[in-house]
Amino acid sequence: VTRHGPSLELAEQVAGRVGLSFSASRKETVASAIDRVMVRRGIGEGRLLLDRLGSDEDLTEDVISAVTVAETHFFRGPEQFELIRQTILPELLRRRPEGSPLRIWSVGCATGEEPYSLAILCEEEGLLDGVRIDAADISRRALAAAKTGDYGEWALRNTGPRLRQRYFTSCEGRFRLNEQLRRQVDFAHLNLGTDALPAPEKRLSDFDLILCRNVLVYLEASAVRRIARQLLDCLSDGGWLLTAP
């Protein structure tokens, strides 16, 4: 495959190589993103890109960052956070064995806004000490950014002044999440396209609540069905899986 404009065939090959499977409506956008990576990297032919994927970690991360959607913000989808606060957490707490922490997993966490929002919510409800939050994403760069807990104004556009003042330190237009909350979230790399789930040896099983939002909408139907089944298998009895918006 030679690069002269976005190639849907190349996009499918590249996506498959990094363990992704995009819906038809998304493939043209993915092809354009891959083309931009090739131009920036000076890679003239698709076969050269394919040859380097996997062995060239930096290039692989470039491609993953280009073709995945990392736009998010704190308390995105506020109606679901209200559902968690008013319904899901109380129900889970009622049936939780004494001394056993609630386990929450944010899948496709991008730069960390979602799991940190969950940590803030649990702290606001006085529950954080009894909750364990894990978070995972395919992009190692996004995970590295998440671990810093450092955000701009746009990421906090749904976060009111009281929460900002209580949980963030501001400096020159940036907001740093308090260390206490950062320590409550464990981040790990995960490729939903290639990694086997459940994975008890990696503590990726028996979750009480799993959030996989704004991920499945970009994947083809067969991948969505497979991943949804795997995530359901990662739940504890009576656990919840949230997949929207």
Residue ranges and their predicted role:
Residues 237-245:
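Conserved beta-strand signature within the Rossmann-like core of class I S-adenosyl-L-methionine
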Residues 85, 116-123, 232:
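A structural alpha-helix within SAM-dependent methyltransferase catalytic domains
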Residues 98-117, 131-134:
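Conserved class I S-adenosyl-L-methionine
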Residues 88, 92, 122-126, 150:
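Active-site catalytic pocket residues across diverse enzymes, especially alpha/beta-hydrolases
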